[in-house]
Amino acid sequence: MGKIVFMFPGQGAQYVGMGKDFYDSFACSKEIFDKANEVLDIDVKKLCFEENEDINITEYTQAAMVTASVAILKKIEEMGLKPDLTAGLSLGEYCALVASDVMSFEDAVKVVRQRGILMQDTVPAGEGAMSAVLGMKKEAIEAVLPDVEGIVTIANYNCPGQIVISGESKAVAEAGEALKEAGAKRVLPLKVSGPFHSPMLKPAGEKLLDVLVDVEVNDPKVPYVSNTRSEERRVGKE
């Protein structure tokens, strides 16, 4: 049998109803949602299961995403499946850290709750945006962006043929039109409320250090891949 990787989604993959089947069907998954409601100042179950607009607002999305992902993880673990490696796209790295036992679920969900608040406060909803650019090489994108007025930059190299741009809402929209004119097959606005992975959020990252300093961090029982370094990590405190 080949090696198994547990990979977790990032912000933008959220939807109303996520995790509800697991909550209704499995005690181990229900326990995760119940724990989230106990340790946070928001009703995560209501956020995930009932129709609402808050699920797409950063300060709420991140805690909801991590809760739903870990709820599914716990059932997979209960089935006896074990990973050889864990990884996560952006926010999903926190779920990977839980899966690798680097931090507890309770700590992770509290950290991402504060992370979401800091990010939202730094760039209020509507002022920043992201779009996925399909069918265009990074060199071509890099040639277009400097001519756009405002802040817009490449944020994620998702895979060959799919690159994400991020920045001020107006600049991202203008860049999208310019990129389509320059040959991009499609430019798709992402379902996020902020300019993630852009210089606009640097102040939020600096403030998050004050939150992380009190978190207990362990060496991983399962290696995980760092988003920052794009390499396998076997030490927790780095």
Question: Where would I find each of the regions flagged by the language model?
Answer:
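Positively charged, low-complexity/disordered segments
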Residues: 236-238
